[in-house]
Amino acid sequence: MPEPLTERQRQILQFIKDEIRTKGYPPSVREIGEAIGLSSSSTVHGHMTRLEEKGYIRRDPTKPRAIEVLDGSHTQLKRTIAVPVVGRVTAGQPILAQESIEDHFPLPADFVRADESELFFLTVQGDSMIEAGILDGDYVLVHRQQHANNGDIVVALIEDEATVKRFFKEQDHIRLQPENRFMDPIIVPDCQILGKVVGLVRRMG
């Protein structure tokens, strides 16, 4: 039998479960405090530590929102991660700067093979990649990195605009090739690679 919970601990645990059910990912410490009426983050952390000691949750202190809810027999529920959805990408600004993040999108943790802190979603604009199956309005899952191999589909920054194209490094230039036979490639001396496309999410209807 797991140790009994105090009323405050029960409230916190229930809020975590509710957030995972409705959003697909756990709440932050700040969100827990606001929901339960605790202004001190250290107090919230203290309750979370007790929940962990009693076997109700498991946390990864190196990752934000990394809370796994356990049942009384320590059986782990399926964990999700919250991947940030980035809006406008601007030169000179970190991709995952707080002001760039528009939302978070939940993914099953076992779907992700890369370091989750290096992942972000970007909304595709236009039909330059339709022959690669990437459509206007899709969300591409991007692994943040500054290098690419020939043939990789990348997010590159050109004149302060992020573009999704297939990357080719040629003799004295970079060719960013659209996957649309009616569009011409972008030829530039060099470009900033923001990341490699590793997945895709599409809303139907």
From Swiss-Prot:
Cystine residue pairs: none
Feature: DNA-binding region: 29-49
UniProt GO BP: DNA repair; DNA replication; negative regulation of DNA-templated transcription; proteolysis; SOS response
InterPro entries hit by this protein: ArsR-like_HTH, LexA, LexA-like, LexA/Signal_pep-like_sf, LexA_DNA-bd_dom, LexA_repressor, Peptidase_S24_LexA, Peptidase_S24_S26A/B/C
Record SUPFAM superfamilies: LexA/Signal peptidase, Winged helix' DNA-binding domain
Enzyme Commission designation: 3.4.21.88
Catalytic activity: Hydrolysis of Ala-|-Gly bond in repressor LexA
Keyword field contains Hydrolase: yes
Site positions (Cleavage): A91, G92
One function term, GO molecular function aspect: DNA binding
CDD domains given in the database record: HTH_ARSR, S24_LexA-like
Broad EC category: hydrolase
Family annotation (Pfam families): LexA_DNA_bind, Peptidase_S24
Residues at the catalytic site: S128, K165
Keywords: Autocatalytic cleavage, DNA damage, DNA repair, DNA replication, DNA-binding, Hydrolase, Repressor, SOS response, Transcription, Transcription regulation
Domain of life of the native organism: Bacteria
Subunit record text: Homodimer.
Function: Represses a number of genes involved in the response to DNA damage (SOS response), including recA and lexA. In the presence of single-stranded DNA, RecA interacts with LexA causing an autocatalytic cleavage which disrupts the DNA-binding part of LexA, leading to derepression of the SOS regulon and eventually DNA repair.
Stated family: Belongs to the peptidase S24 family.
Name of the protein this chain belongs to: LexA repressor
Species, as recorded: Symbiobacterium thermophilum (strain DSM 24528 / JCM 14929 / IAM 14863 / T)
UniProt gene name: lexA
